[in-house]
Amino acid sequence: MEMLQGLLLLLLLSMGGAWASREPLRPWCHPINAILAVEKEGCPVCITVNTTICAGYCPTMMRVLQAVLPPLPQVVCTYRDVRFESIRLPGCPRGVDPVVSFPVALSCRCGPCRRSTSDCGGPKDHPLTCDHPQLSGLLFL
């Protein structure tokens, strides 16, 4: 009987590994398509561009005794490989550089947020809002 219970336990544990290795219920950190609003101080227009950004879930941990121990560093979904593309904003006055660059995520990873290259804040209320009138279409360089 003990042998049968041991085999059953082994079978259940091996199947659990197969279940855990399948696609997660929530998408892990990966590049996704997104629309960004692009504008520049001194130029009277705003343009929306299609790009890829990093989004998804990263494993995090929290201490049970938060008051006693320091917090654990948390990771975020951030760029691994990125390239920058540029567009030219129309209607910029003389003396204002009309070229604006934006990131295109090539690959992503879970890691610490680098404030030097990323916005580490939470979700924005209105990510596509512009201070200037919005134009459709792109003027890539």
UniProtKB/Swiss-Prot annotation:
Pituitary gland. One of its GO terms (biological process) is signal transduction. Its main location: secreted. One of its GO terms (cellular component) is extracellular space. Belongs to the glycoprotein hormones subunit beta family. It is linked to Hypogonadotropic hypogonadism 23 with or without anosmia: A form of hypogonadotropic hypogonadism, a group of disorders characterized by absent or incomplete sexual maturation by the age of 18 years, in conjunction with low levels of circulating gonadotropins and testosterone and no other abnormalities of the hypothalamic-pituitary axis. HH23 male patients have normal sexual differentiation, reduced or absent Leydig cells, reduced or absent spermatogenesis, and absence of spontaneous puberty. This is Lutropin subunit beta.
